[in-house]
Amino acid sequence: MNDMQSQIEHRELCQRRDKEFLALYHATLDAFLERGMDHRQARRAAVEFTIANGHPHYHVNHERAYRCVCHLLNSEQKRGNGSRTYRNIEDKGFAKNRLRRLMWLEITQRVGVLTKRGLSIEKAIDHVLEHCRASRFFISPTTALTKICPASRTRALR
């Protein structure tokens, strides 16, 4: 896949994630407002609640998932063999964003369970990405706010 196609697919996956986030966010915000919360306070609470308690699909590229999962599984095997390995994932140049790293570790853990049951890595990744739900939204509250109100891209949650 060339770079342009990759960027387009990434944008589409982000849009799907954002759509899923916004649907859950608006339902949560309505519930908080019905309870008489101040709009500003309800917005912050709805963002934090949706991020922590939403169970979205994994909106990631299959090729990228394959590379990241194989990378993590190989580093796990090296650690188990006692061979020299890097101290942590960041040392090898893996995802530096904490939330993104947590997402990849979660996907890898699910793939690992399926491969132990006899599925190939490719089929396990396909199954996880198509049928499993994430434990949370792997975005920060600040990023979530930019999805809710695009005009607030320069403002953080207050």
Pin down the residues of each PLM region:
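Low-complexity, PEST-like segments
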Residues: 1-122, 139
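Short alpha-helical "recognition helix" segments of helix-turn-helix
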Residues: 50, 124-133
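C-terminal engagement modules used by replication, chromatin/transcription, nuclear envelope/ESCRT
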Residues: 143-158
